[in-house]
Amino acid sequence: MPKMKTHRGAAKRFKKTGSGKLKRAKAFKSHILTKKSSKTKRNLRKSGLVSEAQEKVMKKLLPYL
């Protein structure tokens, strides 16, 4: 069986944590920021985790991560 290919777009966007979960950046932080409060923008700087529902899909995209 041939090697599985890593989805390069996904590999650039996700990192694996020590416990094996996938870390991601939050959306809505690139433009149209004037109407968002400082608190909202500050919270968007923090990283998020991939939901359990999406983790199965991500494991297929990132077999070696």
UniProtKB/Swiss-Prot annotation:
What biological process terms from GO does the record include? translation
The annotated region (Disordered) lies at 1-26
Q: Can you name one GO molecular function term for this protein?
A: structural constituent of ribosome
**Which InterPro entries would you find in this protein's record?**
Ribosomal_bL35, Ribosomal_bL35-like, Ribosomal_bL35_CS, Ribosomal_bL35_sf
Alphabetically sorted, this entry's keywords are: Ribonucleoprotein, Ribosomal protein
Instruction: Respond yes or no to whether keyword Ribosomal protein is given for this record.
Output: yes
| Matching Pfam families | Ribosomal_L35p
Q: Specify the superkingdom.
A: Bacteria
A Gene Ontology term for the protein's cellular component:
cytosolic large ribosomal subunit
Give the family per the record.
Answer: Belongs to the bacterial ribosomal protein bL35 family.
Q: What PANTHER family does the annotation carry? A: 54S RIBOSOMAL PROTEIN BL35M, LARGE RIBOSOMAL SUBUNIT PROTEIN BL35M
* HAMAP family xref list: Ribosomal_bL35
Name the UniProt record assigns to this protein: Large ribosomal subunit protein bL35
This chain is encoded by the gene named: rpmI
